[in-house]
């Protein structure tokens, strides 16, 4: 029987009232009695402080301020201490008889916050003779002692042999030691556990039913099923880890894709740039050589063009000099032709205008006579019409206003006065003072006759004037002709000069007739002279081109020599053309073949790369397609063998997994049906009862029970009989054993133990011999040992399976690679190397190009000679027909003589042309120049006087006519007669009006008709005058212009001038054409020279730049090559198939890869920076650095424990295989890890059933507890309805909710929470997450409802509440609950500590006087039965006959307070022993 640990004593050092006091504690009840302020609460506060040194929990309520809403700052501890170092120590002895002193060092902290500093410590190995007070105090004299600080205490204890001192920095470590040594009943791992322990102590200290405990009885009484929860958590953690691993694999697969993408794009980016630089370097070298060849050729061409330019410039200067003379001659000929044409046109105009003027003169004279007659008739018609109009107006006015007619006398008086005025005017004009109205008519006839006579006289003078004017105009015309021909002269000299001019005109006309024959002769000679000059020019040009002077006699022989040379060169050129065509044809064939090979080369190179990779992977060399197919067959055989071995290993691994799963079942049941049957029968599996069997005892018990090791232990077999009827879902052999599962032992059988075997006597006539199994599986330790060995075997099998899977996938990938190679490259992989053939063809092409170049040079020289010979023959063909002209030396003298004679004839022709018409007009009228008509002015004066007389006579006749017309007005002197005859007057007026209107109409018609006719006559006259004046003026202008021209226009002049101009134009055109040809040729030559010069400078610059670039690039390229070889990436970068792409394609490829790489390395700062630096086109080595950095980056991410290679490309291939295998393995592992919902329900139900049985056992211990009217106390445990429904669904209807448990997105806890919400939609889950709710649902305690019930009087069983019980009953009931909690904690912790330790049990009860004697006796009995220590505080002694009683009295001595303590140890025959008193110390009431 294991003894229970006990608290031996409590020691207070330097507390208020207690300087150094040790209270020995009774094994059962220790009573502290005393009045108010005696120090009872201080003593228990010191005990609690040493037990739970947590300032966040300690709160002694009897020292709080009254009525305050918050506690005291020091929470009752600061005021209980004295200044300086204080101690509270507990002296204990545990079940192992080990003395352990635990305590705390306390010290007040200065400040108004009233804080206390606590340091927990423990002392082990202290001898029993040493008292706690001796450890922490030092005696100074008989009445003085000093409290040792903690460091001195430590030094003091370290000096003692075998004593261990431990100081703790955390309360958790302090409580952990106390738990391990059996001082406290429960392991306090966290602040929550400490809080529960403190609440329990606090509830016992102050008594009553603690609501804090009763509300959370599940947390206090029901142990946390940490194993089940840990199993669930491990399962979920494993599933979570599995899923995270799968997700990591998926991420790794994406990383693998990223790695592949990164390697692919980095290779494309760097290899494209690498090959582009390699191609550019080769191209630059070729260009440098080509520039050098072109430079040499261009220099030769420039020298040839310079020689050619000098020759053409000299010839052009000669043509420019000749062109100036030709232009002057041509311009003079053109001007002469224009003058001749102008003179001819002028002469034609003059003749046409003179004829028109004669005709207009006649028409003008006739029209003047017609107009004069029309004017006279017009005047008469106007007078007649005016009189008729006046009379009509007067009659109308009279008829329109009859009253006016009555007043006509006044009007007639006016008319009468007007008539008198007209009469007076006529008298004045006609000089007739005796003129009257009656005689006016007679005088009118007289004056009309006089007017007619004056008109006839004027007409006679006018006729004479016209005749005189005609004679005068002929003289003036002849005089003007003489002046026009000879110039200004006197009128009397005109006759002599005119006769001289007519004689000179005859001589000049004779000379003018010789112009045409002379001109024709001159034209012929000039033509021969020009041909002679052209022949001389052609001969000089020919000699200059030939570079030698030739005589005329040598030209024919030279002509024959040149024709023979042309025939020979023509044959050579023809043969050269055929040879050049053959060479070019061969060159084109070579180029076509090279292009074909260049197109085939990338395919062949890709096939070779693939073949090399296959060779590296398999370590074989392939020389033909047959080797490839044979190796593929070998691969298939190896794959088949590897798959068979992998499947065998996989089957064994699955068997091991199944065995591990079977052995991992809770309770050791290998058959799930046994768990269900045990729950159904209300029993426990035998394997679960013996679950704690050690590994050494496992073989014995396994052999002891034999086949019945999987039996079910039931309390009563008779109650199971009814369940066995119709039972089918069970193992073939089901063993049932009757017994108490709580106290089951192996006394069921009679056993004889042998060597490694047992003999079990089942019955008198039936024995069973069982050997100890080599691998026992009975008990948790044996199963764990077996599981451990199975796990080791599984690790080996898993590693072997992984290796085989890797090998299989590697072989499969190799097989796929061979299949791809056969499908894509086998047809071309073993063909001849196209690059070698390309190199041979390029060599031949260079030879052909060199031969073509030499052939072109030779052909060019022959063509130049051929062209020169053709030009010489052409020139000789033009020279030879003119040899006779070249021999004529007198041709130029004859031309000059004929030209002088032609000049004289042309001068005479110009005189005739200029004055021929004047002389022709002068000749018929030259006789009128003999006399000058001087009487012409007198005749003009007589004609003017006659006109004036005719006008005066006309005015006189008009004045008399007016008088005659107004004769009627003279009779208006008397108007009386008009007033008496009104009606007659009206009638007469009407008759007169009609007559007057008719007369007026006739006068108007006559006037209108004659006016229109007169207007037409005047218009015709004005038109004739205008035409005559215009033509006269134009004629004078034309005559002046003809004189200004100074050229005589005859019929042949224009033709001769045109012929001369055309000849000069032809010469000028030929000269200009040749000059233009030379200028164009010279310009072209200059342009060609400029182009050649620029080309030469450009070629020199390009050549030197290219050479410098080649030299510079060589250094950079050497650095790149050195970096490539040092890092071993040449095989990756030197991709020969890229050499056949253009620079633009490679740059585009690199740019595309760069864009992809920027996205790929966006999250990697190092690679991003290196990539940014590599973008510098002037530093190609940085791209190599980037490629190396990428490879290094990928190498660092290769797991060397899985992938054993440094090559990232190979690593990626191995990674694909490994990730595929891991994915498959983890998927199967997830399926095995997943626990079924039915298993969860069974585990929770089994746990609930076990705890219900345990609570039932606890209730048995409380059946006899009674306090007052309370006869019994018990705990009631029920399963919540909502949770019971959840368990039913999990076990029976889980198929309906597999959508939750099969979801990869939900953990089991989340799926359980979702199911709970689905079943109980009315419950508000608040802000809690499904994971939190699920974890709560995995804790069986949340399925139970617990409450405390009391059997009180006649009320029966009631819920234990403070309001329904008396104070004493509540204290007793609360104490019973606390005892149950402590006992439950011990049961829960039994598995965690050593089995040889039974922890201390101690509770408090302050103010115990509220209990009666019976209740006190019940407490004492309870403590005795449960081996529990109890500390009671009361004002008076309570049952001093039992336990130990301390009497505390606070006394004042010399202004100091101290507590006097007297201890009694029960009632005995001997006198009560007085315990040592306390030291004095100043204190305040506690």
From Swiss-Prot:
Subcellular location(s) of the protein: Cytoplasm, Nucleoid
Keywords linked to the UniProt accession: ATP-binding, Cell cycle, Cell division, Chromosome partition, Coiled coil, Cytoplasm, DNA condensation, DNA-binding, Nucleotide-binding
Function statement: Plays a central role in chromosome condensation, segregation and cell cycle progression. Functions as a homodimer, which is essential for chromosome partition. Involved in negative DNA supercoiling in vivo, and by this means organize and compact chromosomes. May achieve or facilitate chromosome segregation by condensation DNA from both sides of a centrally located replisome during cell division.
GO cellular component, one term: nucleoid
Domain notes: The hinge domain, which separates the large intramolecular coiled coil regions, allows the homodimerization, forming a V-shaped homodimer.
GO MF, any single term: DNA binding
Gene expressing this chain: mukB
Family matches, as Pfam families: MukB (PF04310), MukB_hinge (PF16330), SbcC_Walker_B (PF13558)
Binding site for ATP: 34-41
Name under which the protein is recorded: Chromosome partition protein MukB
Self-association state and partner proteins as the record states: Homodimerization via its hinge domain. Binds to DNA via its C-terminal region. Interacts, and probably forms a ternary complex, with MukE and MukF via its C-terminal region. The complex formation is stimulated by calcium or magnesium. Interacts with tubulin-related protein FtsZ.
Family of this protein: Belongs to the SMC family. MukB subfamily.
Organism lineage string: Bacteria, Pseudomonadati, Pseudomonadota, Gammaproteobacteria, Enterobacterales
Record region (Flexible hinge): 666-783
One Gene Ontology term from the biological process aspect of the record: chromosome segregation
Signal peptide residues on this chain, from the entry's feature table: none
Record flagged with keyword ATP-binding: yes
Coiled-coil segments: 326-418, 444-480, 509-603, 835-923, 977-1115, 1209-1266
């Amino acid at each position: 029987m294991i003894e229970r640990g006990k608290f031996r004593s409590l020691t207070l050092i330097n507390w208020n009232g207690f300087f150094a006091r040790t209270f020995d504690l009774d094994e059962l009840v220790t009573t502290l009695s005393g009045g108010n302020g005696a120090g009872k609460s201080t003593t228990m506060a010191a005990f609690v402080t040493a037990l739970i040194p947590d300032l966040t929990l300690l709160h002694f309520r009897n020292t709080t301020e009254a009525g305050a809403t918050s506690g005291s700052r020091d929470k009752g501890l600061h005021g209980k201490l004295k200044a300086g170092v204080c101690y509270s120590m507990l002296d204990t002895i545990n079940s192992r008889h080990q003395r352990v002193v635990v305590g705390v060092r306390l010290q007040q902290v200065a400040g108004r916050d009233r804080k206390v500093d606590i340091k927990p410590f423990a002392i082990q190995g202290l001898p029993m003779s040493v008292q706690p007070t001796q450890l922490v105090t030092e005696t100074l004299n008989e009445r003085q002692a000093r409290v040792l600080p903690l460091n001195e205490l430590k030094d003091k204890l370290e000096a003692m042999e075998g004593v261990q001192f431990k100081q703790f920095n955390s309360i958790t470590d302090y409580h952990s030691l106390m738990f391990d040594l059996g001082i406290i009943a429960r392991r306090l791992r966290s602040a929550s556990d400490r809080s529960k322990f403190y609440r329990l102590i606090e509830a016992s200290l102050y008594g009553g039913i603690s609501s804090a405990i009763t509300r959370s009885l599940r947390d206090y009484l029901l142990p946390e099923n940490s194993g089940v929860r840990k199993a669930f958590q491990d399962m979920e953690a494993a599933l979570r880890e599995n899923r995270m691993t799968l997700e990591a694999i998926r991420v790794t697969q994406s990383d693998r894709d990223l790695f592949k993408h990164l390697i692919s794009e980095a290779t494309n980016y760097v290899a494209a740039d690498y090959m582009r630089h390699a191609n550019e370097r080769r191209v630059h070298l070729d260009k440098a050589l080509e520039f050098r060849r072109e430079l040499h050729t261009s220099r030769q061409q420039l020298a040839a063009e310079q020689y050619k330019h000098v020759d053409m410039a000299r010839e052009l200067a000669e043509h420019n000099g000749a062109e100036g003379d030709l232009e002057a001659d041509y311009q003079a000929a053109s001007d002469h032709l224009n003058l001749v044409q102008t003179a001819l046109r002028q002469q034609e105009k003059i003749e046409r205008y003179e004829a028109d003027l004669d005709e207009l003169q006649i028409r003008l004279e006739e029209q003047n006579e017609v107009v004069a007659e029309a004017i006279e008739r017009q005047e008469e018609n106007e007078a007649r019409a005016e009189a008729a109009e006046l009379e009509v107006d007067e009659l109308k006015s009279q008829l329109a206003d009859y009253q006016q007619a009555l007043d006509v006398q006044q009007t007639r008086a006016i008319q009468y006065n007007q008539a008198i005025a007209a009469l007076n005017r006529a008298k004045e004009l006609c000089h007739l003072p005796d003129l009257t109205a009656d005689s006016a008519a007679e005088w009118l006839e007289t004056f009309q006759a006089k007017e007619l006579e004056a008109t006839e006289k004027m007409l006679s003078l006018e006729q004479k004037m016209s005749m005189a004017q005609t004679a005068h105009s002929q003289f003036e015309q002849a005089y003007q002709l003489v002046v026009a021909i000879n110039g200004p002269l006197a009128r009397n000299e005109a006759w002599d000069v005119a006769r001289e001019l007519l004689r000179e005109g005859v001589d000049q006309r004779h000379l003018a007739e010789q112009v045409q024959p002379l001109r024709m002769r001159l034209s012929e000679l000039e033509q021969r002279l020009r041909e002679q000059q052209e022949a001389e020019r052609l001969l000089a040009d020919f000699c200059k081109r030939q570079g030698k002077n030739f005589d005329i006699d040598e030209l024919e022989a030279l002509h024959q020599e040149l024709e023979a040379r042309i025939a020979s060169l023509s044959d050579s050129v023809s043969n050269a053309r055929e040879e050049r065509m053959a060479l070019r044809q061969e060159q084109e064939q070579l180029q076509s073949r090279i292009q074909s090979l260049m197109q085939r080369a990338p395919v062949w190179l890709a096939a070779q790369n693939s073949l090399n990779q296959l060779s590296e992977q398999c370590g074989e060399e392939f020389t033909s397609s047959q080797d490839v197919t044979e190796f593929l067959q070998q691969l298939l055989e190896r794959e088949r063998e590897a798959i068979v071995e992998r499947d065998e290993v996989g089957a064994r691994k699955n068997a091991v997994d199944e065995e591990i799963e079977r052995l991992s079942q809770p309770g050791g049941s290998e058959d799930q049906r046994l768990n269900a049957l045990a729950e159904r029968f209300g029993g426990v599996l035998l394997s679960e009862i013996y679950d704690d069997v050690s590994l050494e005892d496992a073989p014995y018990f396994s052999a002891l029970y034999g086949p019945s090791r999987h039996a079910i232990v039931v309390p009563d077999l008779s109650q199971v009989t009814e369940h066995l009827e119709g039972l089918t879902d069970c193992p073939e052999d089901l063993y049932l054993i009757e017994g108490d599962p709580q106290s089951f032992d192996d006394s069921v059988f009679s056993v004889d133990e042998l060597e490694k075997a047992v003999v079990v006597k089942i019955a008198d006539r039936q024995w069973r011999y069982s050997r100890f199994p080599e691998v026992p599986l009975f008990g948790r330790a044996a199963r764990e040992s077996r599981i451990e060995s199975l796990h080791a075997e599984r690790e080996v099998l898993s590693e072997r399976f992984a290796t085989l899977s890797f090998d299989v996938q590697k072989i499969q990938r190799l097989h796929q690679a061979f299949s791809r190679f056969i499908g894509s490259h086998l047809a071309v992989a073993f063909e001849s190397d196209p690059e070698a053939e390309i190199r041979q063809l390029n060599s031949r092409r260079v030879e052909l190009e060199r031969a073509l170049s030499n052939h072109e040079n030779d052909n060019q020289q022959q063509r130049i000679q051929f062209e020169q010979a053709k030009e010489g023959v052409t020139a000789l063909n033009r020279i030879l027909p003119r040899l006779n002209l070249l021999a004529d030396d007198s041709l130029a003298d004859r031309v000059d003589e004929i030209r002088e004679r032609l000049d004289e004839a042309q001068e005479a022709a110009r005189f005739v042309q200029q004055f021929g018409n004047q002389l022709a007009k002068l000749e018929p009228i030259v006789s009128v120049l003999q006399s000058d008509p001087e009487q012409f002015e007198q005749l003009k004066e007589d004609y003017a006087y006659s006109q004036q007389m005719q006008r005066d006579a006309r005015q006189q006749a008009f004045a008399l006519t007016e008088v005659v017309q107004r004769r009627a007005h003279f009779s208006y002197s008397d108007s009386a007669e008009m007033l008496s005859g009104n009606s007659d007057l009206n009638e007469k007026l009407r008759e007169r009006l009609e007559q007057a209107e008719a007369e007026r109409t006739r006068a108007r018609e006559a006037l209108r008709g004659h006016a229109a006719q007169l207007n037409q006559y005047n218009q015709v006259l004005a038109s004739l005058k205008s035409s005559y004046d215009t033509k006269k003026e134009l004629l004078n202008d034309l005559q002046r212009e003809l004189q200004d021209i100074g050229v005589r226009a005859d019929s042949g002049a224009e033709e001769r001038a045109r012929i001369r101009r055309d000849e000069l134009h032809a010469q000028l055109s030929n000269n200009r054409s040749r000059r233009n040809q030379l200028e164009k040729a010279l310009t072209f030559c200059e342009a060609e020279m400029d182009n050649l010069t620029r080309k030469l400078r450009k070629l020199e610059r390009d050549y030197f730049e290219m050479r410098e670039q080649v030299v510079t690039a060589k250094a950079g390229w050497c650095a790149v090559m050195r970096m490539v070889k040092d890092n071993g990436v040449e095989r990756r970068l030197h991709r020969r198939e890229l050499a056949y792409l253009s620079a633009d394609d490679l740059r585009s490829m690199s740019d595309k890869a760069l864009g992809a790489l920027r996205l790929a390395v966006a999250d990697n700062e190092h690679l991003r920076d290196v990539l940014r630096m590599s973008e510098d086109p002037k530093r190609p080595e940085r791209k190599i650095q980037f490629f190396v950095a990428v490879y290094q980056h990928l190498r660092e991410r290769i797991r060397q424990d899985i992938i054993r290679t440094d090559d990232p490309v190979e690593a990626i291939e191995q990674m694909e295989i490994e990730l595929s295998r891991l994915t498959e393995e983890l998927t199967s592992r997830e399926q095995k890890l997943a626990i079924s919902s039915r298993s969860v329900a069974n585990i929770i139900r089994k746990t609930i059933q076990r705890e219900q049985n345990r609570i039932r056992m606890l209730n048995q211990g409380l059946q006899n507890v009674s306090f007052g009217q309370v006869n019994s106390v018990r705990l009631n445990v029920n399963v919540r309805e909502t949770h019971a429904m959840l368990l039913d669904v999990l076990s029976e209807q889980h198929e309906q909710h597999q959508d939750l448990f099969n979801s990869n997105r939900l953990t089991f806890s989340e799926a359980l929470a979702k199911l709970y919400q689905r079943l109980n939609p009315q419950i508000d889950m608040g802000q809690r997450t499904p994971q939190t709710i699920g974890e709560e649902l995995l804790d069986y305690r949340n399925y139970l409802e617990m409450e405390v019930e009391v059997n009180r009087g006649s009320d029966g069983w009631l819920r234990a509440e403070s309001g329904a019980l008396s104070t004493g009953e509540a204290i007793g009931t609360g104490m019973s609950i606390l005892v149950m909690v402590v006992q439950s904690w011990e049961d829960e912790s039994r598995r965690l500590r050593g089995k040889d330790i039974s922890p201390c049990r101690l509770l408090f009860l302050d103010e115990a006087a509220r209990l009666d004697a019976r209740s006190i006796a019940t407490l004492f009995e309870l403590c005795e039965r449960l081996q529990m220590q109890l500390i009671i505080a009361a004002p008076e002694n309570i049952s001093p006959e039992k336990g130990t009683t301390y009497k505390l009295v606070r006394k004042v001595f010399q202004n100091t307070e101290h507590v006097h303590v007297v201890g009694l140890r029960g009632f005995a025959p001997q006198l009560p022993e007085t315990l040592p008193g306390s030291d004095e110390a100043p204190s305040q009431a506690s």
